[in-house]
Structures are given as structure tokens and as C-alpha cells.
Regions:
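Structural motif
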Residues: 85-86, 132
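Conserved phosphate/ATP/ADP-binding segment of small-molecule kinases
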Residues: 99, 106-181
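Histidine-anchored nucleotide/phosphate-binding helix
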Residues: 1, 102
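Conserved N-terminal subdomain of the carbohydrate kinase-like
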Residues: 2-85
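Aromatic/hydrophobic pocket-lining residues that form π-stacking "cages" and hydrophobic walls in ligand
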Residues: 21, 99-101
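Glycine- and other small-residue-rich loops at beta-strand/loop junctions that grip anionic moieties
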Residues: 10, 89-91, 112
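Active-site-adjacent beta->alpha loops and helix N-cap segments on the catalytic face
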Residues: 92-99
């Protein structure tokens, strides 16, 4: 990853997919020694269907194993977390775990991918603790309450996010590209 030391801190099952994910991630140069291998659990899976413009039509997933990524698990790695150059998280982990991470990251910038309109509400009250947010159109609308009918609305949404303390917004607009603020 651009010649930088990178770690994956996640939970995987003791199944074929978990072992494959760890092996391929290691092969790509990412350290996986902070991953939790959960016996008897399935590794997360996700499938989405996109329309011709790149907008998601529907998605299904099994993220049950992410419940094992808890504040208790993260607290075992507090020095590692606070020594990072940047933390990238998503909203698949529980709200309490996300809040713990945001409260304990110290001065480390935290980048967040909301992952869905349903899950993004976990961070609504914590935007000031997030350095960079990468929502899609629907996630940005859900968080801000502002309709994104065209690119002109992106600036209004960006102002809303920055007013609520967010440092950087990378807004995915599907077929309309990306808005960066």
C-alpha cells in the first residue's frame, strides 16, 4: 500500500474465506497479526448489484462476526491504535465500538466509510471526531437531511458536514463522479 506499513484489524471466521482473506491480505503487504480469528463463525460476506451508472440497487450481507470487534477487543490494542498515523474504520462495527474508537484515537486522524444509509446514523453525533468521511449520495442525504438531486446540491451538503465539525468530505455521486471538500 504505497510502501507504507499497514495493518488490518478485524474479525474473521476460522473458515476457508477467513483463511483466504488473511493469506491474500498478507501477500499484498498488509499485516494481519491484529486480526481476531473467531472459531465457529463465518467470515463476513457482502454482495451488491449496481445499475449502469454505478448506483447501488440492492445489497445483501452477513456481517454478524463484526460483533466481535468490540471496545474490549480494541482496548487490548490501545497503544497500537494511538500510535497509528491514520485509522480507517467503517460503520459495520457497533455504535458503541465506533464511539470508543473515536474517543480513544487520541490525535490520530480517523477516516470513516459509512457503508450504508442504515448504518451511517451511528456517526451522526460524532462528525467532529472524524477527519475524513466517504459517504455515497444516500448516506450523505441520510446524515445531513439534504436532498442530493444534482451536483449543485453537493456544496450545500459539504457545508452542512463542515459546519458539524467534519474536516474532509469525499462524496461519491455514482455516475456523477466524486465531490471533494
Amino acid at each position: 500500500l504505497l510502501g507504507k506499513n499497514s495493518w488490518l484489524m478485524s474479525a474473521v471466521g476460522d473458515d476457508f474465506y477467513g483463511q483466504s482473506l488473511l493469506a491474500q491480505t498478507t501477500q499484498s503487504g498488509v499485516n494481519v497479526d491484529k486480526c481476531l480469528i473467531v472459531n465457529g463463525e463465518n467470515t463476513s460476506s457482502y454482495l451488491s448489484l449496481l445499475d449502469k451508472t454505478g448506483e447501488m440497487l440492492v445489497a445483501i450481507n452477513d456481517m454478524t462476526i463484526s460483533e466481535h470487534i468490540s471496545a474490549e477487543f480494541l482496548s487490548q490494542h490501545i497503544d497500537f491504535i494511538q500510535g497509528a498515523k491514520v485509522i480507517v474504520a467503517d460503520c459495520n462495527i457497533s455504535e458503541s465500538t465506533l464511539v470508543w474508537l473515536l474517543n480513544n484515537a487520541g490525535k490520530v486522524p480517523v477516516f470513516v466509510d459509512p457503508v450504508s444509509a442504515w448504518k451511517c446514523v451511528k456517526i451522526r453525533e460524532h462528525l467532529a471526531q472524524i477527519h475524513t468521511l466517504k459517504p455515497n449520495r444516500l448516506e450523505a442525504e441520510t446524515l445531513s437531511g439534504i436532498s442530493l438531486s444534482d451536483r449543485n446540491d453537493a456544496e450545500k451538503v459539504a457545508v452542512w458536514f463542515h459546519t458539524h465539525g467534519l474536516n474532509r468530505l469525499v462524496l461519491s455521486m455514482g455516475g456523477d463522479g466524486v465531490y471533494y471538500s
